[in-house]
Swiss-Prot record:
Entry EC number(s): 2.4.1.303
Domain of life: Bacteria
Example of a GO biological process term: O antigen biosynthetic process
Gene expressing this chain: wbbD
pH dependence as annotated: Optimum pH is 7.
Organism field: Escherichia coli
Keyword Mitochondrion assigned: no
Protein name, entry field: UDP-Gal:alpha-D-GlcNAc-diphosphoundecaprenol beta-1,3-galactosyltransferase
InterPro entries cross-referenced by the UniProt entry: Glyco_trans_2-like, Glycosyltransf_2, Nucleotide-diphossugar_trans
GO cellular component annotations of the record: plasma membrane
Cofactor: Mn(2+)
Alphabetical list of CDD domains matching this protein: GT2_AmsE_like
Amino acid sequence: MSDDTPKFSVLMAIYIKDSPLFLSEALQSIYKNTVAPDEVIIIRDGKVTSELNSVIDSWRRYLNIKDFTLEKNMGLGAALNFGLNQCMHDLVIRADSDDINRTNRFECILDFMTKNGDVHILSSWVEEFEFNPGDKGIIKKVPSRNSILKYSKNRSPFNHPAVAFKKCEIMRVGGYGNEYLYEDYALWLKSLANGCNGDNIQQVLVDMRFSKETAKRRGGIKYAISEIKAQYHFYRANYISYQDFIINIITRIFVRLLPTSFRGYIYKKVIRRFL
């Protein structure tokens, strides 16, 4: 990339239950990218362990880390909203604390955004893994620009671990909300409804950690109730139609309430393509 490469911020939120090893691997993947971020903003969502703090400190010599701590755990949406206000640059690239960015991720984003100045939200495909990247062979694809609006009526049109956006546009629509477990999906629907343009790079740029424990957490009564509340909010806000609302509730709640072992199998074989 040339000397006039746009500067950008990487935004990450962590909390007390995050793995120090996974966080270190995530930060290493940022460091190994072919284009370096101008800053890495890390928000502690409440107090975290000394091990997590040690990992952050160990990477300060390699990355321009600017870290902040919320007084108490406020949830991902609130942590990211706080982080957005700390980002110096309009181009913000999200990074999760347990995922691995491929070495060309930032370069691909910068190249795409430079050539497509009217795009405000951008993500890419992700490949799931459990222990080592590539060990599951499951790629979560998301559509290109022309299909995003239709796709968004039934599922998130962007892969949150792989997303980048223009801060000014996200702030214009009010940033992340407090939709428990669905902060990202709600933001995308709100942004699209308010004139933001989105697209997806049609290649894998992030290896996303997705273990059996992750599948277990994505089910049960609590998750099902959150699903109903989120879908009802989307309907009341006119992001989706009544028909979309009913279809989404029937298909999603059925999956959330399946027995854990069976849900994991169905999720792997079928549902992962749709939820």
